Amino acid sequence: MKRVCIIPCGAKKIWDVHPEAGSQPANLVYLSPLHQRTKSYAQTFFSDWLIISAKHGFLKADEIIHENYDVAFGTPHADQITREALRQQFHEKHLTAYDELVILGGKKYRKVIDPLLLPHQTAIYPLAPYKGIGYMLQALKQAVETKVELPPHI
């Protein structure tokens, strides 16, 4: 079974700490604790992983982000990626080739990811049972430290 991990971006970005940073690869842009922990989890358990951004859509680690932004799924914003553009990226970035997508985000991502899935695909949300970011951070840390993946949750 071919799997990919999708991790959330995060509100805190490199330009919030270093305004002079200029353009940066996506894997260096996002600084929030949840993003850092999900990235560590993705790098530990998956050979393929992407970041999902409400502005840029699906990002590979080496894709360049040029400037700060404040756009989130679930909050209307003129700069939010359209469903059509996200669907196009889903195909262009070959996410259709995966059988299982492991989404390390909260329930708001179901509305974004699930409509993109093809019949052969399943989306797993291992953080869904956790009530709050603190519990999510703890679970992710323990999973990485023990090298045991979080149980699947559909």
Predicted feature locations:
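Peripheral peptide segments
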Residues: 1-154
